[in-house]
Amino acid sequence: MNQLEQLRQFTTVVADTGDFQLMKQYTPQDATTNPSLILKAVQKPEYRHLLEKAVQDHHGNGGVDAVMDEVLIAFGCEILAIVPGRVSTEVDARLSFDTEASVAKARHLIQLYEQRGIARERVLIKIASTWEGIRAAEILQRDGIRCNMTLLFSLVQAVACAEAGAQLISPFVGRIFDWYKKQAGEQWDAAANGGDNDPGVRSVRQIYDYYKKFGYPTEVMGASFRSTTQILSLAGCDLLTISPELLEQLAAGQGPVAHKLSVDQAQAANIARIAADEPAFRWQLNEDAMATEKLAEGIRLFAADAVKLEKLIGEIAK
């Protein structure tokens, strides 16, 4: 049994890509997309037709915004024809500090899916884990619109998401690792900060243990991986979303995979509850330089890629 097959015994495997042709061979349960992955995919010749069709059908009716939504839905529907489970579709990162606009955009995306015969249960709406984004998720979840809280780098963000009733969170492993490695510079000790001691792995384990200790139903899906070592260090997490490149490495890997995270261990752990109301959330996030910087950077990067996609749409529409 290869490492991917072994991992599936403990964890739901999710494909992290907009390249739906590439994901087929790994038979993931779910798939996740984001603005950067969609931008990357539409620049490939085999997906160009989806962008061109969206422009042709919608540019005169709703402009660039309508085309952007149509592109997201087109990719989502193609992915849902491949995976048996759910697809994650992201709300524009430029709405990350606007609760009302995030709610409106999420409802519109779900409406577009439902018009194509896709049940809302098969869609997760991705929203950045800002205070405003978490409040949007709270409203949406009450409407039966399930949310995947992204750009999550800290325990306080995770606790606030769980208390808001979010369906799922995506704590980022690789970007946390990147931050600590960059801070350490030449002092970075790869051996001391690898495997179970990887700062990104430790963050997800802390969140997973907290959720299971206190009985939160919110699903934990580790995301943003730099290596198969990071992935295998989180075997047992509810879900892990993995790029095709790393799925390929796992499928070729033959070493044993150990069960790392478990509900029993988490429930037996000595963990204190933390406050996650607005003052506590803002203070704890502000105290965490890594989480503050990575959340801000992540929003900027996703927003920049949304702008690039808009420019691409504008060029095709001319």
UniProtKB/Swiss-Prot annotation:
Give the keywords, sorted: Cytoplasm, Pentose shunt, Schiff base, Transferase
Q: What is this protein called?
A: Transaldolase
Q: What is annotated about its quaternary structure and interactions?
A: Homodimer.
Which pathway does the UniProt entry assign to this protein? Carbohydrate degradation; pentose phosphate pathway; D-glyceraldehyde 3-phosphate and beta-D-fructose 6-phosphate from D-ribose 5-phosphate and D-xylulose 5-phosphate (non-oxidative stage): step 2/3
PANTHER family from the xrefs? Answer: TRANSALDOLASE
Query: What family is this?
Result: Belongs to the transaldolase family. Type 1 subfamily.
**Active site at which residues?**
126 (schiff-base intermediate with substrate)
Q: Does the keyword Cytoplasm apply?
A: yes
* Coiled-coil ranges per UniProt: none
Q: Tell me one Pfam family matched here.
A: TAL_FSA
Tell me which PROSITE patterns the record gives. Answer: TRANSALDOLASE_1 (PS01054), TRANSALDOLASE_2 (PS00958)
Alphabetized InterPro entries for the sequence? Aldolase_TIM, TAL/FSA, Transaldolase_1, Transaldolase_AS
Q: Does the keyword Glycosyltransferase apply?
A: no
Task of the protein: Transaldolase is important for the balance of metabolites in the pentose-phosphate pathway.
Could you tell me the superkingdom of the organism this chain comes from?
Answer: Bacteria
Q: Name one GO biological process term.
A: carbohydrate metabolic process
Q: What is its EC number?
A: 2.2.1.2
- Tell me what reaction this enzyme catalyses: D-sedoheptulose 7-phosphate + D-glyceraldehyde 3-phosphate = D-erythrose 4-phosphate + beta-D-fructose 6-phosphate
Q: Which residues cross the membrane?
A: none
**Under the GO molecular function aspect, what terms does this record hold?**
transaldolase activity
**Any one GO cellular component localisation term in the record:** cytoplasm
Q: Which cysteines are joined by disulfide bonds?
A: none
Naturally occurring in which organism (per UniProt): Cupriavidus necator (strain ATCC 17699 / DSM 428 / KCTC 22496 / NCIMB 10442 / H16 / Stanier 337)
Where does this one sit in the cell? Cytoplasm
